[in-house]
């Protein structure tokens, strides 16, 4: 009888500690010391939330930088999401997969060997908000033409916004770069 009572007490104490006190402590620490990160690293522009620093968006206008292709189409197709239940993730397709090849041809003009790998392939999460500086610089002439500004101004903006990779190439956040473009004075 004593063993059963001890087991029940230990179970209740463990449930209170692990199910209430620990999550409460982690939530409080997050909200006090890491408020921006704990709430999704949201970015505001013109007093409204326009996205997250951590999740890529689908950009199609020629006046903006385009992010990486998304294996989950940035969850813009609710029917597809409903069918396979995937909200993020890579495609896990091999190099010879016909669907992958078709998707890469869709994202890249066929025969253009001057394309960075991140312009043609999706990331592991399918929602990567960054592109390499090299990719951004290759998009600069298109953006400069669409905005009627010099390519050097766009390149300077890219260099100013680049983040150093530790074991990777230097990269830029596409949403932050596009907001900086909109803020740029002609």
UniProtKB/Swiss-Prot annotation:
<dbReference type="InterPro" id="IPR003820">
    <property type="entry name" value="KdpC"/>
</dbReference>
<feature type="transmembrane region" description="Helical">
    <location>
        <begin position="10"/>
        <end position="30"/>
    </location>
</feature>
<keyword id="KW-0630">Potassium</keyword>
<dbReference type="GO" id="GO:0005524">
    <property type="term" value="F:ATP binding"/>
</dbReference>
<dbReference type="Pfam" id="PF02669">
    <property type="entry name" value="KdpC"/>
</dbReference>
<keyword id="KW-0547">Nucleotide-binding</keyword>
<keyword id="KW-0406">Ion transport</keyword>
<keyword id="KW-1003">Cell membrane</keyword>
<keyword id="KW-0472">Membrane</keyword>
<keyword id="KW-0067">ATP-binding</keyword>
<protein>
    <recommendedName>
        <fullName>Potassium-transporting ATPase KdpC subunit</fullName>
    </recommendedName>
</protein>
<keyword id="KW-1133">Transmembrane helix</keyword>
<keyword id="KW-0813">Transport</keyword>
<comment type="function">
    <text>Part of the high-affinity ATP-driven potassium transport (or Kdp) system, which catalyzes the hydrolysis of ATP coupled with the electrogenic transport of potassium into the cytoplasm. This subunit acts as a catalytic chaperone that increases the ATP-binding affinity of the ATP-hydrolyzing subunit KdpB by the formation of a transient KdpB/KdpC/ATP ternary complex.</text>
</comment>
<comment type="similarity">
    <text>Belongs to the KdpC family.</text>
</comment>
<dbReference type="GO" id="GO:0005886">
    <property type="term" value="C:plasma membrane"/>
</dbReference>
<keyword id="KW-0633">Potassium transport</keyword>
<dbReference type="GO" id="GO:0008556">
    <property type="term" value="F:P-type potassium transmembrane transporter activity"/>
</dbReference>
<keyword id="KW-0812">Transmembrane</keyword>
<comment type="subunit">
    <text>The system is composed of three essential subunits: KdpA, KdpB and KdpC.</text>
</comment>
């Amino acid at each position: 009888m004593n063993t059963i009572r001890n087991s029940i007490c230990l179970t209740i104490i463990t449930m209170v500690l692990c199910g209430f006190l620990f999550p409460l402590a982690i939530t409080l620490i997050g909200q006090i010391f890491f408020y921006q990160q704990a709430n999704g690293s949201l970015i505001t522009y013109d007093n409204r939330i326009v996205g997250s620093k951590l999740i890529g968006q689908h950009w199609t206008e020629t006046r903006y930088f385009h992010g990486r292709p998304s294996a989950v189409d940035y969850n813009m197709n609710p029917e597809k999401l409903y069918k396979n239940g995937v909200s993020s993730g890579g495609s896990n397709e091999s190099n010879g997969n016909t669907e992958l090849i078709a998707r890469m041809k869709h994202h890249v003009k066929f025969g253009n060997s001057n394309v960075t790998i991140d312009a043609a392939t999706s990331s592991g999460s399918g929602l990567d908000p960054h592109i390499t500086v090299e990719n951004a610089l290759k998009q600069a002439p298109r953006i400069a033409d669409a905005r009627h500004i010099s390519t050097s101004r766009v390149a300077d903006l890219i260099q100013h916004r680049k983040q150093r990779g530790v074991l990777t190439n230097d990269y830029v956040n596409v949403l932050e770069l596009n907001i900086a473009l909109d803020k740029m004075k002609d």
